[in-house]
A protein has these predicted regions:
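Short, amphipathic alpha-helical interaction segments positioned at domain boundaries
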Residues: 202-226
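Short amphipathic alpha-helical interaction segments
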Residues: 172-184
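A short, conserved structural fragment
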Residues: 186-195
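Residue-level detector of family-conserved "landmark" positions at structurally sensitive sites
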Residues: 19, 68, 177, 194-195
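C-terminal scaffold of the Radical SAM
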Residues: 1-172, 219-226
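Minor-groove-contacting beta-hairpin "wing" of winged helix-turn-helix DNA-binding domains
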Residues: 196-200
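Long, highly charged amphipathic alpha-helices
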Residues: 53, 177-180, 209, 213
Length: 226
């Protein structure tokens, strides 16, 4: 833990800090090292202790905890990532880049050589439509998928999940159902609400699980719109 405190002390004067739990990717060198028991991952209790140390550090040095894994000095929030969390459309340009236009998401192919070849062909022939399906893939987002993504991302931020926004953008019935779903989470002190759902300090430790509890499926959407 002392090493962690020293790491935080080193970055105390920068305006923005992102701290994410490490995701162990299969086939990576670290994965192999851990599989061979040359290193071990910290247990949950140790991770929670690190998080508490991080929060204390952030408060002491006037960082705003504006997203579960992100801290900033005033006016230094990440504009790039905030677009994801606030459901704003964005355009990705380049190999493997992702784009989002509210109703769909698309991602460009990841092979750089193929990407360049397709662009050359488009520039030569001037017919983008013939290459569209080869250059990127697209996923159409259903209303249930859209509201679930909003719940998942907004709950991670200090701005919270607004029931009025859900009622206006998706369906009043969605907002009514969501208000009913949170009662047990409120009793267990995971979430609080006055028309805006926000995670408590305790709830932040279980953000993904809580969001999943609040998700809607396609049948929910059909039922609310009958």
């Amino acid at each position: 833990m002392q090493q962690w405190k020293e790491n935080l002390h080193f970055v105390k004067n920068i305006p923005h800090i992102s701290c994410y739990c490490l995701t162990l990717e299969p086939h990576s060198q670290l994965y192999k090292t851990i599989q061979q028991k040359q290193l071990s991952l910290p247990d949950d209790d140790h991770i929670i202790e690190q998080i508490e140390v991080l929060k204390d550090f952030a408060h002491q040095h006037q960082f705003i905890h504006y997203e579960i894994s992100n801290f900033c000095k005033e006016n230094f929030h990440s504009r790039h990532n905030s677009a994801y969390w606030q459901r704003k459309p964005y355009l990705g340009i380049g190999c493997s880049a992702h784009s989002f236009d509210i109703n769909s998401r698309q991602w460009n192919i990841c092979n750089i050589n193929s990407y360049i070849e397709f662009l050359d062909e488009i520039n030569t022939h001037g017919d983008y439509q013939n290459f569209e399906n080869r250059l990127f893939e697209r996923e159409i987002l259903t209303p249930a998928m859209q509201v679930n993504e909003y719940i998942m991302t907004s709950l991670r931020t200090i701005y919270g999940c607004h029931l009025d926004y859900i009622a206006h953008e998706f369906s009043p019935a969605f907002a009514e159902q969501l208000a009913k779903k949170i009662s047990l989470l409120q009793q267990d002190n995971y979430i609080f609400s006055h028309g805006i759902l926000r995670l408590t300090e305790k709830g932040m430790l279980f953000a993904d699980a809580i969001a999943a509890e609040l998700f809607f499926d396609e049948n929910d959407y059909l039922t609310t719109n009958e």
